Amino acid sequence: MKVFFAVLIALFVCSMVIGIHGGVPINVKCRGSRDCLDPCKKAGMRFGKCINSKCHCTP
């Protein structure tokens, strides 16, 4: 049972790392993540967040 939980946690951490690095920065300035929703949808991505005053979009 301990091995199962260890594998489950490892898969969860790996999926988070892949999700974080899957972001694509676009050349749109933002002040908050809410400003990135429409530009990211226009770029074909579902999610967006504001990092260092630039929008980063993820599928």
From Swiss-Prot:
SUPFAM superfamilies tied to this protein: Scorpion toxin-like
Compartment annotation: Secreted
Pfam families per UniProt: Toxin_2
Endpoints of the signal sequence: 1-22
Tissue: Expressed by the venom gland.
Annotated function: Inhibits insect potassium channel. Is at least a 100-fold more potent against the Drosophila Shaker channel than towards its mammalian homologs Kv1.1/KCNA1 and Kv1.3/KCNA3.
Domain comment in the entry: Has the structural arrangement of an alpha-helix connected to antiparallel beta-sheets by disulfide bonds (CS-alpha/beta).
Sequence similarity: Belongs to the short scorpion toxin superfamily. Potassium channel inhibitor family. Alpha-KTx 03 subfamily.
The protein's name in its UniProt record: Potassium channel toxin alpha-KTx 3.10
Species, as recorded: Buthus israelis
